């Protein structure tokens, strides 16, 4: 048995301590984890410095921001765990009840998933978020961090286990796979005897590898090639504010805008205003400017590189924005449906017909009217922290909170009935 299999077995053995715990016991465990995380801040920051040193010069600045931890972010991680503790416990919720003509009483009841596996890349906060959500939803969790964030993840898990050791929940219910190589991931993908669910969080390559190779049930958290369409009837003040936030708020995350579509009837006047905001305005403020990848029409109005063949299919996760002009809302929708990833897409318009057409025909997990796509987030949606953004339709779609990490079963109460 490999080390990875041993860790999977430990998680499976420990799941009973989680799925038999009541809400009060789980909440005590989460609060102890949060306190322990803050108490271990110096150890976690020291580990994070090792990750940052190893990554120096190898990843862009926007990706370094995803990897970076500081005291404020550790406090935010701890507060995220406390927020999960404050949420209602989904386990045991009665979803439906019915009584059949023969007197059988049927109850549909929400239950824990069992053991949840998470394969993720260079975001240390995923470690604590995933552990908190899994435990509150009644499941053990097996974490496999990317190499970039492994030292940080190891220190975070050590702190979480220290907190759990003070409660009745077995600390082995949280496992961090030590093998950060490809084999560690593939063992998890094949671990159908141990894992009830596997969730990948990361770039397109990671997600594709998991979806194509896993024999464990997978919830796909797709990449975010996020679009915003500025309609000819848009309020320009709203549009500029929304685009600025959606692109520059935190470009390294999956709900950040990557493609801007602008109605050709306003492009000549709107795009220069946008350029002043995203390029000159940010340079004057000492901030990184946005770099444009432009289709031929957009290139007539603002400066930037000519868009390459793949620029409208790329999740840049950087201060880069692909810009294209379109003749109508119908053309915008056609482009998004052909090139998007069904994550989050938005329209800015004061035209109700255009908004209704857009929301009806865009088949994405979150569709926005006159708002930044940066709101696609478990915390912003009132779910607490999230396990990821699902872009598939089966079981879960959009931000995955506690309810999305559970299943259900039927309890059938009889008085001796038999089927004739």
Curated annotation (Swiss-Prot):
Enzyme Commission designation:
1.2.1.41
List the catalytic activities from the record. Answer: L-glutamate 5-semialdehyde + phosphate + NADP(+) = L-glutamyl 5-phosphate + NADPH + H(+)
What GO biological process terms are annotated to this protein in UniProt? L-proline biosynthetic process
Keywords of this protein's UniProt record, alphabetized?
Amino-acid biosynthesis, Cytoplasm, NADP, Oxidoreductase, Proline biosynthesis
Q: Which GO terms describe its cellular component?
A: cytoplasm
UniProt enzyme class: oxidoreductase
CDD domains attached to this UniProt entry = ALDH_F18-19_ProA-GPR (cd07079)
User: Is this entry keyworded Flavoprotein?
Assistant: no
Q: Does the keyword NADP apply?
A: yes
What pathway does the UniProt record associate with this protein? Answer: Amino-acid biosynthesis; L-proline biosynthesis; L-glutamate 5-semialdehyde from L-glutamate: step 2/2
Q: Which SUPFAM superfamilies match?
A: ALDH-like (SSF53720)
Q: From the UniProt record, which GO molecular function terms apply?
A: glutamate-5-semialdehyde dehydrogenase activity; NADP binding
Q: Which Pfam families does the record cross-reference, listed alphabetically?
A: Aldedh
What does the UniProt entry say about where the protein is found?
Cytoplasm
Q: Sorted alphabetically, which NCBIfam families does this protein's record hold?
A: PRK00197.1, proA
By sequence similarity, the record places it as follows: Belongs to the gamma-glutamyl phosphate reductase family.
The UniProt function text for this chain reads:
Catalyzes the NADPH-dependent reduction of L-glutamate 5-phosphate into L-glutamate 5-semialdehyde and phosphate. The product spontaneously undergoes cyclization to form 1-pyrroline-5-carboxylate.
- Entry protein name: Gamma-glutamyl phosphate reductase
Species for this entry: Neisseria gonorrhoeae (strain ATCC 700825 / FA 1090)
């Amino acid at each position: 048995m490999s080390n990875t299999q041993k860790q999977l077995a430990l998680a499976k053995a420990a799941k009973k301590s989680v799925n038999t715990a009541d809400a009060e016991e789980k909440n005590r465990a989460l609060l102890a984890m949060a306190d322990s995380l803050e108490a271990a801040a110096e150890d976690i920051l020291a580990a994070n410095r090792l990750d940052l040193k190893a990554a120096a010069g190898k990843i862009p600045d926007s990706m370094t921001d995803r990897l970076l931890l500081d005291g404020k972010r550790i406090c935010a991680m701890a507060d995220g765990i406390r927020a999960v503790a404050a949420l209602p416990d989904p386990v045991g919720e009665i979803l439906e009840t019915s009584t059949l003509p023969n007197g059988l009483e049927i109850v549909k009841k929400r239950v824990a998933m069992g053991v949840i596996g998470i394969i993720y890349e260079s975001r240390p906060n995923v470690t604590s978020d995933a552990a908190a959500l899994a435990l509150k939803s009644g499941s053990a969790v097996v974490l496999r961090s990317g190499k970039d964030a492994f030292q940080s993840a190891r220190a975070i898990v050590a702190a979480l286990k220290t907190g759990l050791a003070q409660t009745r929940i077995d600390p082995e219910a949280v496992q961090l796979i030590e093998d950060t190589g490809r084999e560690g991931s593939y063992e998890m993908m094949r671990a159908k005897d141990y894992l009830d669910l596997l969730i990948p969080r990361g770039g397109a390559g990671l997600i594709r590898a998991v979806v194509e190779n896993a024999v464990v049930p997978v919830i796909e958290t797709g990449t975010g090639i996020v679009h915003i369409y500025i309609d000819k009837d848009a309020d320009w003040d709203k549009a500029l504010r929304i685009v600025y936030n959606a692109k520059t708020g935190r470009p390294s995350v999956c709900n950040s805008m990557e493609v801007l579509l602008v109605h050709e009837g306003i492009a000549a006047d709107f795009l220069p205003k946008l350029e002043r905001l995203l390029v000159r305005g940010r340079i004057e403020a000492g901030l990184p400017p946005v770099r444009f990848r432009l289709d031929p029409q957009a290139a007539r109005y603002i400066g930037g590189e000519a868009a390459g063949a793949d620029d409208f299919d790329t999740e840049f996760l950087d201060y880069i924005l692909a810009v294209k002009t379109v003749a109508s809302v119908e053309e915008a929708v056609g482009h998004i449906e052909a090139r998007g990833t069904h994550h989050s897409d938005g329209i800015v318009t004061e035209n109700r017909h255009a908004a209704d057409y857009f929301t009806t025909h865009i088949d994405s997990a979150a569709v926005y009217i006159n708002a930044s796509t940066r709101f696609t987030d478990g915390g912003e949606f009132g779910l607490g922290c999230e396990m990821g953004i699902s872009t598939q339709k089966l079981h879960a779609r959009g931000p995955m909170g506690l309810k999305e990490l559970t299943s259900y079963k039927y309890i059938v109460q009889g008085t001796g009935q038999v089927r004739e």
